[in-house]
Amino acid sequence: YAGNSYRHCLVVSGGVTGHDLTPPHDISDKSVYGRLPKGENGEFYADLMKRSFTLLNDHPVNLKRVKEGKKPANSIWLWGEGTKPALEDFSKMRGLKGGIITAVDLVKGIGMLAGMRILDVDGITGNYDTDFKGKAEAAADALLNDGLDYVYIHIDAPDECGHRGDCAHKVYSIEQIDGKVLKTLFKRFENAGEDFTLLVCPDHSTPCDIKTH
């Protein structure tokens, strides 16, 4: 199933869990040797990854990227094994209706399982080129005009920049959060005369010097 950016979804029907699958962003600038899938079906998954190179390396898209001086997407990398969690509907638990804004399908899926409304926003990418203000405006519209009690805005840009070791764009992303997300929300709610609570909570650090969590 096609997702966004480098995150896509492989569904293995009747598969087993317990594999050792290395997240690619944990081994930036490191060798992949010794980090291929391990476990009951590890050899099968590793073979899929190796065979994908044969299919993708000479693909017209990759030939064009190489010609343009870009890195080719010449293989798949399997990681992030999991099963569908059983989450309770938050609105039924607390009587509060919520929404979620994100470009990351994993986060979107968690919101759906928790009974949150998915708020689609044009121009969001999950990276530093996302529409920061568009996210804030969509959240404010949903809260002020569409009956929602809370909205979770997921912004992945600083994390992605950290994984790339891109300090300049990480700083830029944080500045955009401050200047275009928080500032927009404050203005919208204050102009509407509404009481509001804003919670800003990072879930982990991603230092540019180590490119991982």
Question: Which residues fall in each region the model found?
Answer:
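Feature captures the catalytic ectodomains and active-site-proximal regions of enzymes
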Residues: Y1-H213
